[in-house]
Amino acid sequence: MTAQLFLTYLVFVAVAVIGISAAYLPRRTTFAIMAGLAIWLVYVGLFSSLGYMRDVSLRPPGIVWVVGPVVLFVVFVARSNIGAGVAAAIPLWLILGLESFRIGVELLIHRLWEDGLVPKLLTYAGGNVDMFVGLSAPIMAWIATRGRLGLRLAMGWNVLGLLSLANVAASSMLTGPLKLISTEVPNVAMGIFPYTFIPGFLAPLAVTLHVLAIRAIAARYRDTRSPASGISALTN
């Protein structure tokens, strides 16, 4: 039952990403996102369903074959003109508000803990504050439209959101297939289908949204230094 709920939510998030891309980005960019997302989801799904994700005998370990490309993609979004274009095209409030999808992810991770598939450390009951990032996302989406102070607060919130993700990622890696630390139950979920889509898609999506938001905020904050451009920038 948990797997069915997870896959349903995964499809919902993926469709939302494609829908927003189609609404705000050029057709060619939207097609590239759709094709790239489809290929990546198939890759992660096959990789995990065949057992490679939890195979610690691989060199490098199976998790690297998923996390490695994700890191390269995030760097591309952070540094490329394409990333800047996407950040400029999608309204800032929408980029920030989309982070609320993390509420559903955290509820599902809590369910996995109840099923004995992840340690309590990865849940909001165990001190994971990522749920609060998701809950505050709609509020921050509104605050970001309130002038330069709002932009500054949104920038700080994004930094805190990235730190929260880094904490969860580190905890997941340490308790994952490599078993670098011991917990009351091992983190087996992240190495099996379909839950490998948490490190393989959902967590990277959260990071990507933060990176896009930071790029958008930086651009808008620069614009507000000019009175004429500041008015138009803050209406987005």
Named regions from a protein language model:
Residues 1-15, 55-67, 196:
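Hydrophobic transmembrane alpha-helical segments in integral membrane proteins
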Residues 9-19, 67-80, 132-141, 197-215:
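Hydrophobic cores of alpha-helical transmembrane segments in multi-pass inner/ER membrane proteins
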Residues 26-37, 90-93, 150-156:
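Membrane-interfacial loop-to-transmembrane alpha-helix junctions, especially the N-terminal start
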Residues 154-170:
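Hydrophobic alpha-helical membrane-insertion segments
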Residues 176-197:
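Short, membrane-exposed interhelical loops at transmembrane-helix boundaries
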Residues 39-111:
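A glycine-rich, hydrophobic loop/mini-helix early in the fold
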Residues 24-27, 79-85, 212-228:
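Membrane-interface capping segments at transmembrane-helix boundaries
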Residues 83-150:
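Membrane-proximal helix-loop-helix units in multi-pass membrane proteins
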